[in-house]
């Protein structure tokens, strides 16, 4: 999915609001995903999945950190997330649909915390970005 210059600007603007909250927003995104889509929990049998869990916070921080990395390399998301793509495709074997579910939950978290920023246009840009990230993370499944 091709991001326009306007999309890139919108995404970068949203992430200026998110960067300082990586752990909290990431944990909230994961908790929301696990509750809304219970089958996603199967990839985390060793995690304490309760609200406020240190494991959820740590992994949430990694998730948002990867998104921040993608934003920082928005013109080469595939290069920025290549190792992460390998990990998810070859070692973890995460069902590709889960990236879409995670993206949806992340959008909800952004909307909750920054409703004035998430205009319809920005929402569309962020959705395109999250789809692009998902496409990169699933590219090596083929």
Curated annotation (Swiss-Prot):
Provide the residue positions that the database annotates as binding heme b.
88
Q: In which tissues is it expressed?
A: Red blood cells.
Q: Which domain of life is it from?
A: Eukaryota
Q: Which Pfam families match?
A: Globin (PF00042)
Instruction: Name any Gene Ontology BP term.
Output: hydrogen peroxide catabolic process
The family classification in the record reads:
Belongs to the globin family.
Kindly provide the name given to this protein in its UniProt entry.
Answer: Hemoglobin subunit alpha-A
- Give the organism, scientific name: Aegypius monachus
Species lineage? Eukaryota, Metazoa, Chordata, Craniata, Vertebrata
